[in-house]
UniProtKB/Swiss-Prot annotation:
One of its GO terms (molecular function) is phosphoribosylformylglycinamidine cyclo-ligase activity. It holds the Pfam family AIRS. PANTHER family: TRIFUNCTIONAL PURINE BIOSYNTHETIC PROTEIN ADENOSINE-3 (PTHR10520:SF12), TRIFUNCTIONAL PURINE BIOSYNTHETIC PROTEIN ADENOSINE-3-RELATED (PTHR10520). Pathway: Purine metabolism; IMP biosynthesis via de novo pathway; 5-amino-1-(5-phospho-D-ribosyl)imidazole from N(2)-formyl-N(1)-(5-phospho-D-ribosyl)glycinamide: step 2/2. InterPro entries: PurM-like_C_dom, PurM-like_C_sf, PurM-like_N, PurM-like_N_sf, PurM_cligase. CDD domains: PurM (cd02196). It is found in: Cytoplasm. GO terms for biological process: 'de novo' IMP biosynthetic process; adenine biosynthetic process; purine nucleotide biosynthetic process. This is Phosphoribosylformylglycinamidine cyclo-ligase. The keyword ATP-binding applies. It comes from the Bacteria. Its EC number is 6.3.3.1. Keywords: ATP-binding, Cytoplasm, Ligase, Nucleotide-binding, Purine biosynthesis.
């Protein structure tokens, strides 16, 4: 006999508790442009003083990295990942993130877990100037197993039309600057999980130190590049930018330039972190496929004039980033050449 909605597997009271736990963190991200309080049907955001604004949108999720989070019972870092995957994409066009919305789905809602996830989303928003203006938490018993969660996000950014970066200014002879990743970011985890399923924890700790677990390394959040890259854009003209996600350098770097151009990357210049070398050793996957699956230590790239390379690298270094030149642009068929 079903006597209440709760008997079907949906606990509204747990949902109310989750909202209360989230509120404080969410409100930390709000600014004077946010015109609505939590609970409104739609979020309102005032654009302010822009002459000819262009809105840039992006949406993404975290993928199977969530399974590691669920096994480790650590959920905050994947909230940061969710934001990073979206804001880094809109950043590629020169846009400053304005606001963010999240979507959380689960089999059985645990208010504490939901709050932990959203605390990570909040942290990601604070790192990227984005206001967390809304979201949806969907408890879906029978669709998801108890203990399973999925999270996705949606971001809107803004840029003046004359400052829009669309790749049309990229030309032969431009140089490619790499900005280091923090690890796997949020891509390639189906392979990562397969490779490390039976991996010897002691060997792993020897590589990274006694106080670092495999979970710590695999759950390192995706780096958010918004603040340092916007600083670069204040001082320099950047012709193209690429967020290196699924498909690695092979799929993502060509996206920021015209079809008649090809990026050339010198693999001996790419500073590949040890974790990727461990993947190579454990899987025996060919080098080219690794570069076409993972970021291989390069999380973001800028295509710039040769005269600006040194000073841009100096600026990024002063902002705490690891940046270095990895290649250039040639006439070609739009495919990446790894030399």
């Amino acid at each position: 006999m079903i006597n209440s909605y709760k008997d079907s597997g949906v606990d509204k009271e747990e949902g109310y508790k989750a909202v209360e736990l989230m509120k404080k963190n969410v409100l930390k991200t709000h600014n004077k442009s946010v015109l609505t309080n939590l609970g409104s049907f739609g979020a309102m955001y005032e654009l302010g003083q822009y002459k000819n604004p262009v809105l840039i949108s992006g949406t993404d999720g975290v993928g199977t990295k969530l399974e590691i989070a669920m096994k480790q019972k650590k959920y905050d870092t994947v909230g940061i990942d969710c934001v990073a995957m979206c804001v880094n994409d809109v950043l590629c066009h020169g846009a400053k993130p304005l606001f963010f919305l999240d979507y959380l789905a689960c089999g059985k809602l645990d208010a504490e877990v939901a709050a932990q996830l959203v605390s990570g989303v909040t942290e990601g928003c604070l790192q990227s100037y984005a206001a967390l203006v809304g979201g949806e938490t969907a408890e879906m018993p029978g669709f998801y197993k108890e203990g399973d969660y999925d999270i996705a996000g949606f971001c809107v950014g803004i840029v003046e039309k004359e400052d829009l970066i669309d790749g049309s200014k990229v030309k032969e002879g431009n140089k490619i600057i790499a900005v280091a990743s923090s690890g796997f970011h949020s891509n390639g985890y189906s392979l990562v999980r397969k490779v490390f399923t039976d991996y010897n924890e002691k060997i792993f700790l020897k590589e990274y130190g006694e106080n670092v677990t495999m979970g710590d390394v695999l759950l390192t959040p995706t780096k958010i590049y918004v603040k340092p890259i916007l600083k670069v854009l204040e001082k320099f003209n950047v012709n193209g930018m690429a967020h290196i996600t699924g498909g690695g350098l092979f799929e993502n770097l060509p996206r920021c330039m015209g079809k008649n151009l090809s990026p050339v990357v010198f693999k001996d210049k790419v500073r590949v972190p040890e974790i990727f070398k461990l993947i190579a050793e454990r899987s025996k996957i060919k080098e080219e496929e690794l570069f076409g699956t993972f970021n291989m230590g390069v999380g973001f790239t800028l295509v710039v004039e040769e005269k600006d390379v040194e000073t841009i690298i100096e600026l990024l270094t002063s902002l705490g980033e690891t940046a270095y030149e990895i290649g250039h642009i040639e006439k070609g068929d739009h495919s990446l050449c790894l030399k």
